[in-house]
């Protein structure tokens, strides 16, 4: 099938090549033989009058022309998928849809487990693939490789629709035996102590509290960097290190790991965990249903003030 001289099947091949960056893997992903994919590459090069890819080792490296084509090709294919292929009404009780969600271990532990429990009741065949916060999470949404992102709203791109889920606040924590961490922690002591910090992905994307501290012109003495909040307490154990962590997660972890908790010595703002999704999914029935579930579960969460009150009592 040709449209204005272009075999539209070639766009599927081009998208697979851009995704896999390997001829064999790209062919496998769209159920083509390797010779057929090689032929498709030749036809693409002829049509666009460009090499499109060069081989570097075992990897196909796209040319600038291929890089410019890729977003439009992916958007066109996503639009076909959303508006034509996936047109059937979504029935949660009967669907076997898998939702791919990018989120931190913090969001998974304090929030998403409630979502999974509810969905297991209402849509038992629906499943989830939880993806870690990566350097290119915005690209995952744009390409349709993820259905949702849960992340601090201030750190989100403006390229996709979003909605607020719940507010969170930060506290300072240390090992239960850390005598240097007092409830009346001074800024001077906070800055001088060794810190455990969380950074996401290979680019070491800053967490919300680091982003705020840098805004105040403050740089901590970092002794350990980890890629998830759930690792932090183990890096504090038996040391005089401290960390800045979301209150809800501290409350949850404190059930099994003894922690000493103190208010931060500077007024870092509460932050909003938000939900973001690809613009092309905005009116999709599956996406709408899942967004409803996520927002309803978020609305049931206690406020940071109530969480702190319960923590002080316990």
From Swiss-Prot:
It comes from Rhizobium leguminosarum bv. phaseoli. Belongs to the LysR transcriptional regulatory family. Transmembrane segments: none annotated. The gene is nodD1. This is Nodulation protein D 1. Pfam families: HTH_1 (PF00126), LysR_substrate (PF03466). One of its GO terms (molecular function) is DNA-binding transcription factor activity. The keyword Iron does not apply. NodD regulates the expression of the nodABCFE genes which encode other nodulation proteins. NodD is also a negative regulator of its own expression. Binds flavonoids as inducers. It comes from the Bacteria. Keywords: Activator, DNA-binding, Nodulation, Plasmid, Repressor, Transcription, Transcription regulation. Residues 6-63 form the HTH lysR-type domain. Residues 23-42 bind DNA. The keyword Transcription applies.
């Amino acid at each position: 099938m040709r449209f204005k001289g272009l075999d539209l099947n070639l766009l599927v091949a081009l998208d697979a090549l851009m995704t896999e960056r390997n001829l064999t893997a790209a062919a496998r992903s769209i159920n083509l033989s390797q010779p057929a994919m090689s032929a498709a590459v030749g036809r693409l090069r002829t049509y666009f009058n460009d090499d499109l890819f060069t081989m570097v080792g075992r990897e196909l490296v796209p040319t600038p022309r291929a890089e410019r084509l890729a977003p439009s090709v992916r958007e066109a294919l996503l639009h076909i998928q959303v508006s034509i292929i996936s047109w059937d009404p979504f029935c949660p009780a009967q669907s076997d849809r898998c939702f791919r969600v990018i989120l931190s271990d913090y969001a998974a532990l304090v929030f998403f487990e409630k979502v999974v429990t509810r969905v297991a009741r209402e849509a038992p065949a629906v499943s989830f693939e939880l993806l870690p916060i990566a350097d290119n999470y915005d690209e995952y949404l744009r390409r349709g490789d993820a259905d949702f992102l849960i992340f601090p709203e201030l750190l989100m791109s403006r390229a996709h629709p979003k909605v607020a889920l719940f507010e969170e606040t930060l506290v300072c924590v240390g090992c239960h035996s850390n005598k240097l961490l007092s409830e009346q922690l001074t800024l001077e002591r906070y800055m001088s102590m060794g810190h455990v910090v969380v950074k996401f992905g290979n680019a070491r994307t800053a967490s919300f509290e680091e982003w705020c501290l840098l805004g105040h012109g403050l740089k901590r003495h970092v002794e350990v960097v980890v890629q998830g909040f759930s690792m932090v307490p183990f890096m504090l154990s038996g040391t005089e290190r401290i960390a800045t962590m979301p209150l809800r997660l501290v409350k949850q972890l404190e059930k099994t790991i003894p922690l000493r908790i103190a208010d931060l010595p500077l007024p870092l703002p509460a932050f909003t965990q938000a939900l973001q999704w690809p613009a092309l999914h905005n009116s999709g029935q599956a996406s709408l249903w899942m967004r409803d579930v996520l927002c309803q579960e978020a609305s049931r969460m206690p406020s940071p003030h109530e969480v702190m009150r319960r923590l002080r009592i316990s």
